[in-house]
């Protein structure tokens, strides 16, 4: 391949010739012999610089005492953003206000009312947040005005658990809760075909999702109504745990859709998932 690319370049001196490959080793060899090589960019997410205020929590440590008082104790727990910001915040932008004793007040900008609202500590299906970041996550997942929530964080930070607990907390408002993840093996190493039907084949991939469901169920006694309700959701397929491989062609209306391990998806797969959403 490399020799062919060099031949084409040498026989077309008036044209720009580059070797396009996703093989990084081949690109290194091309560079060593002076051949221009590029990565295949079509199936790759463009790295666009995101403004800091769009992706991080805005920390304010010098807010006036009267603003903190109004945010924490007023009837609507809301303050005018002009009291703490020079520029209008982005919709659903998150804030942390430093108060005494190293505590913080968590807040979120609501574009509908043009005010900054207090984010209270809420629990979802018995799961309580352990830090401010989890508090923000539950608040976003329980907010029906926010149609798309993206949770990022390290391993074991509770992303899937919080999303699933929030969905189960609102299960009466949706026709179906769909929990899915791509069938990607660690290290992308193929282990061959698995025996059994579709359910048996997908079981190893979907086990992490079942583990999160079992964490929620473990809070209740098997004889309790809550435990029986969760069991019924799975049995009646109102809570459906499924691989992403079978989502093409479906229309998901009035559904709470959770995608786990989304970083393993290609841009084409992300587009396919988004176009499945109904009203």
Which residues does each predicted region cover?
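Hydrophobic anchor at the beta1->P-loop junction of P-loop NTPases
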Residues: 151-153, 163
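Conserved RecA-like ASCE ATPase "motif II neighborhood" in helicase/translocase motors
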Residues: 235-271
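Pre-Walker A (Motif I) flank of P-loop NTPase domains
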Residues: 144-150, 254
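Conserved catalytic network of the ASCE P-loop NTPase/AAA+ motor domain
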Residues: 10-12, 143, 170-172, 248-251, ...
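Conserved glycine(s) of the Walker
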Residues: 156-158
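Conserved P-loop
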Residues: 161-229
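Feature 3881 marks metal-assisted phosphotransfer/nuclease machinery
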Residues: 1-18, 22-144
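Conserved, well-folded catalytic cores of nucleic-acid-processing
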Residues: 4-11, 32-36, 40-43, 144, ...
């Amino acid at each position: 391949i490399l020799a062919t690319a060099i031949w084409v370049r040498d026989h077309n001196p008036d044209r720009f010739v580059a070797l396009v490959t996703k093989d990084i080793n081949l690109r290194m060899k091309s560079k060593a012999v002076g051949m221009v090589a590029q990565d295949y960019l079509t199936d790759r997410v463009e790295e666009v610089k995101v403004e800091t205020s769009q992706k991080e929590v805005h920390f304010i440590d010098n807010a006036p005492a009267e603003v903190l008082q109004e945010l924490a104790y007023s009837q609507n727990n809301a303050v005018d953003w002009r009291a703490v910001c020079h520029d209008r915040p982005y919709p659903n932008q998150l804030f942390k206000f430093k108060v005494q004793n190293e505590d913080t007040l968590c807040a979120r900008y609501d574009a509908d009312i043009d005010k900054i609202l207090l984010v209270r500590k809420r629990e979802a299906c018995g799961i309580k947040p352990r830090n401010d970041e989890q508090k923000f996550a539950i608040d976003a997942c329980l907010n029906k005005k926010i149609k798309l929530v993206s949770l990022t964080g390290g391993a074991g930070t509770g992303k899937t658990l919080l999303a699933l607990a929030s969905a189960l907390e609102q299960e009466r408002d949706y026709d179906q809760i769909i929990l899915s993840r791509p069938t990607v093996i660690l290290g992308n190493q193929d282990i061959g075909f698995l025996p059994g039907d579709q359910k048996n084949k997908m079981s190893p991939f979907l086990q992490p999702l079942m583990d999160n469901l079992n964490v929620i169920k473990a809070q209740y006694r098997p004889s309790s109504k809550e435990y029986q309700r969760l069991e019924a959701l799975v049995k009646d397929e109102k809570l459906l745990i499924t691989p992403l491989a079978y989502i093409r062609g479906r229309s998901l209306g009035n559904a709470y859709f959770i995608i786990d391990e989304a970083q393993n998806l290609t841009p084409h797969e992300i587009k396919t998932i988004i176009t499945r959403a109904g009203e």
